[in-house]
């Protein structure tokens, strides 16, 4: 990848992939993953905002609030009219 450093255009291929900053970033990334993995097993109801008990958490904790009214009127379900259900396929006798 091409990048600019100190006003010069440099090619990314000249940098070593095993430089110290890459190794330290990789180490801390793996360490954070392992710590978060075991924390999620030990305390599964901990979120970024802290511990969330099921009793203290409401349905609309994300700040959006309850949904509004439907935009159009829904039709009434009428069980007395309409076509009959199709017959079951396969028949009987284990076929």
From Swiss-Prot:
Question: What GO CC terms are in its UniProt record?
Answer: endoplasmic reticulum; endoplasmic reticulum membrane; plasma membrane
Q: How does it sit in the membrane?
A: Single-pass membrane protein
Keywords (alphabetical) are: Calcium, Calcium transport, Cell membrane, Endoplasmic reticulum, Ion transport, Membrane, Selenocysteine, Transmembrane, Transmembrane helix, Transport
| Coiled coil (residue ranges) | none
Renumbered residue ranges of the record's region Disordered: 48-95
GO BP annotation list: calcium ion transport; protein palmitoylation
Q: Give the Pfam families listed for this entry.
A: SelK_SelG
Keyword Oxidoreductase found:
no
Q: Which residues cross the membrane?
A: 20-42
Q: What is its main location?
A: endoplasmic reticulum
Q: Where in or outside the cell?
A: Endoplasmic reticulum membrane; Cell membrane
Q: What functional role does this protein have?
A: Required for Ca(2+) flux in immune cells and plays a role in T-cell proliferation and in T-cell and neutrophil migration. Involved in endoplasmic reticulum-associated degradation (ERAD) of soluble glycosylated proteins. Required for cell surface expression of CD36 and involved in macrophage uptake of low-density lipoprotein and in foam cell formation. Required for palmitoylation.
- Which PANTHER family does the entry link to? SELENOPROTEIN K
> What family name appears in the similarity comment?
Belongs to the selenoprotein K family.
Q: What is this protein called?
A: Selenoprotein K
Give the species this sequence originates from.
Xenopus tropicalis (Western clawed frog)
């Amino acid at each position: 990848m091409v990048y600019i450093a100190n006003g010069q255009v440099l090619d990314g291929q000249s940098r070593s992939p095993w430089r110290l900053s890459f190794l330290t970033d990789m180490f801390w990334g793996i360490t954070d993953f392992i710590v978060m993995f075991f924390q999620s097993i030990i305390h599964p109801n901990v979120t970024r905002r802290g511990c969330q008990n099921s009793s203290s958490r409401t349905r609309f904790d994300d700040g959006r609030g309850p949904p509004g009214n439907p935009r159009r009127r829904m039709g009434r379900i009428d069980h007395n009219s309409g076509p009959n259900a199709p017959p079951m396929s396969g028949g009987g006798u284990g076929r």
